[in-house]
Swiss-Prot record:
Annotated protein name in UniProt: Protein Smg homolog
Gene from which this protein is expressed: smg
PANTHER family to which the protein is assigned, alphabetical: PROTEIN SMG
Similarity comment: family membership: Belongs to the Smg family.
InterPro entries recorded: Smg
Length: 152
């Protein structure tokens, strides 16, 4: 799934530009992705793109501190929680977006969840939501896509 998401991110500046799902599926098949990965990635993107931010908006009100539940602490490594905090502290994630990212991270198979996957997932959530991202923070997240810094 993550390879398909990475490919789509690199090929499209706007997820709304995908057009017809069946045509996109054929294009992805032609590039070499299998149907299961394509379906999983497109379903995931649809769910993120269609997700209403409304359930999360309460997090934007006030200046409270995010306390992780025990189950979240067990699931999300200190590195992943640190990444989320760093991105929020530096304006890349609003509290509502943070909650959406946490929900998406908790949906992953624990074996798939590492810091690079978390960076990629944050980038995909922000991309699907068409959110603005500070350039230097975007650069840090893009390292997860390219495996190396893209700016020198």
């Amino acid at each position: 799934m993550f390879d398909v998401l990475t490919y789509l991110f690199e090929q499209y500046s706007d997820p709304a530009a995908f057009g017809d799902r069946s045509a996109l599926t054929r294009q992805l098949n032609a590039v070499g992705f299998d149907d299961d990965d394509i379906g999983e990635a497109l379903d995931w993107l649809d769910s993120v793109g269609e997700a209403s931010v409304e359930p999360y908006l309460g997090a934007d009100e006030g200046s409270g501190l995010r306390i992780y539940a025990d189950s979240e602490l067990e699931y999300l490594s200190p590195d992943v929680r640190g990444l989320i905090q760093f991105l929020e502290d530096n304006g890349a994630l609003s509290p509502a977006q943070r909650e959406m990212v946490i929900d998406r991270l908790l949906e992953l198979d624990p074996e798939d969840l590492d810091i690079d996957t978390a960076k990629l997932l944050v980038l995909m959530v922000l991309w699907a939501q068409q959110a603005e991202l500070p350039i230097l923070l975007g650069e840090a997240l893009l390292e997860a896509v390219h495996g190396e810094p893209t700016m020198q």
